[in-house]
UniProtKB/Swiss-Prot annotation:
<keyword id="KW-0689">Ribosomal protein</keyword>
<dbReference type="GO" id="GO:0003735">
    <property type="term" value="F:structural constituent of ribosome"/>
</dbReference>
<dbReference type="InterPro" id="IPR021137">
    <property type="entry name" value="Ribosomal_bL35-like"/>
</dbReference>
<keyword id="KW-0687">Ribonucleoprotein</keyword>
<dbReference type="InterPro" id="IPR037229">
    <property type="entry name" value="Ribosomal_bL35_sf"/>
</dbReference>
<dbReference type="InterPro" id="IPR018265">
    <property type="entry name" value="Ribosomal_bL35_CS"/>
</dbReference>
<comment type="similarity">
    <text>Belongs to the bacterial ribosomal protein bL35 family.</text>
</comment>
<protein>
    <recommendedName>
        <fullName>Large ribosomal subunit protein bL35</fullName>
    </recommendedName>
</protein>
<dbReference type="Pfam" id="PF01632">
    <property type="entry name" value="Ribosomal_L35p"/>
</dbReference>
<feature type="region of interest" description="Disordered">
    <location>
        <begin position="1"/>
        <end position="20"/>
    </location>
</feature>
<dbReference type="GO" id="GO:0006412">
    <property type="term" value="P:translation"/>
</dbReference>
<dbReference type="GO" id="GO:0022625">
    <property type="term" value="C:cytosolic large ribosomal subunit"/>
</dbReference>
<dbReference type="InterPro" id="IPR001706">
    <property type="entry name" value="Ribosomal_bL35"/>
</dbReference>
Length: 64
């Protein structure tokens, strides 16, 4: 059976940490930021851990 390929879209969006958690960027911080509150854009800054319900699916796409 051939090796499973990594989902290229998922590999660009998700990273695995040293402890095994899967992290992602938060949405809504790419463009049209002019009308969004500074407080909101600060909150959307940085990375966050993937929801527990999605971990299995994302791991499968990353062949982990």
């Amino acid at each position: 059976m051939p090796k499973a390929k990594t989902h290229s879209g998922a590999s660009k969006r998700f990273r695995k940490t040293g402890t095994g958690k899967i992290v992602r960027q938060k949405a809504n911080r790419r463009h049209l930021l002019e009308h969004k509150a500074t407080k909101r854009t600060r909150r959307l800054d940085g990375r966050t851990v993937v929801a527990p319900n999605d971990v299995k699916r994302v791991t499968k796409m990353l062949n982990g």
